[in-house]
Amino acid sequence: MEEKKKIRVAILMGGTSAEREVSLSTGANIIEYLNRDKYEVIPVEIDKNGRWIALPDQKKPSLAKKQELIKKQKLNKKQSEIPTESIFNEEIDLKEIEKINDKYLSSEFKLLEKANPILALNYEDKKIIKDFKPAIDVVFIALHGPQGEDGKFQALLDLLDIPYTGSGVMASALGMNKLLSKRLFTQAGILVSKYIDINLEDWQENIKKQIKKIKDKIGFPAVIKPVGQGSSVGVSIVKAEENLEEAMKLAFEYDPIVLVEEYIKGTEVACGILGNEDPIALPPIEIVPKGEFFDYTAKYTPSECEEICPARISEEMTKKVQKYALKAHKALGCVGFSRVDMFVSGNDVYVSEVNTIPGLTYASLYPKEAKAAGISFSELLDRLITLALENPVKY
């Protein structure tokens, strides 16, 4: 009997965003739990300069080792460096890396290295696509934040006609933009907190005027967020006017547009969505941060946050949370999976945002919700890859 051919999965991780370390952790977890009987695993790490490096498969990559893997070595006859914050051990043979790169990262990625950050694909050069497609069956996108979760890599993979996990270009871009997604939620009849947006130019031109605008339209406490970041990067809760300028300055470091939201007092929950044409809502998870809010540290440090799944809300409210999570997921045109962040206040459910590539680290919310639904992490990865290979219409 002929042995069934394994599915070749490239795990795309790392990248240039502020969420690089989260991405590496997500990638490491995926690599560890993928079934080697079904999959040929190709880890692909994008370094801080945007360079792509295919690495050997290691069943248990070590995130603890953040030393330089190989310093200032020639890779594919180019002066590239293995990223200093690699998830892999430093004992890997350089020749093995070169061999893997020759096999999996063919002409189009060498072109990308030259063109980065400006993508310059030759649409008439069909050889580019033909060279790459036999090497990879599907890409598991483990990137987070801008230039990973915002539609850019999704567009590249669409051009190359390569299936990938998660949502398409439009849904990814909308999910990354908190301002546009809030406008869409409102149009879809989904409750959102009161908000205004302020751009850097207006802020610098007249800070006092913008502070008055915030006081009059939102008040305190207020939530300050960069429009295009995830993992609570650059987010602050401001309780009084004297702390506002500092919080705005922090948010503007990450994005030229800042969202100022009404603070909703209530129970913070997240609800995962899984599926393509007929997605299901997973059991909601309740988030109880030990600090002021569910910030970057609380999200990725288990001791900093208590997470309870299923959430301690009524059965009726659970159904309501799941209903609006599905509604938000569909409003953006998401497919595959997502995680919808919400607040329950009294009888109301406020949708905060949709994460089109939820974290899949050991500390992440989405795998815990899947587990509560009876789905193991390995099975979850199988489902996500299967959903990607179904090749649904992606927007």
Locations of the language-model features?
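ATP-binding N-terminal substructure of ATP-dependent carboxylate-amine bond-forming enzymes
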Residues: M1-M170, L174-M176, L180, N199-K209, ...
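Hydrophobic beta-strand scaffold residues
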Residues: V41, P163-Y164, V192, A222, ...
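Active-site "cap" helix and flanking loop/linker of ATP-utilizing ligase/carboxylase catalytic domains
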Residues: E286-S338, K368-Y395
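Glycine-rich phosphate/pyrophosphate-binding beta-alpha loops
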Residues: G145, S232, I287-G291, N355-E369
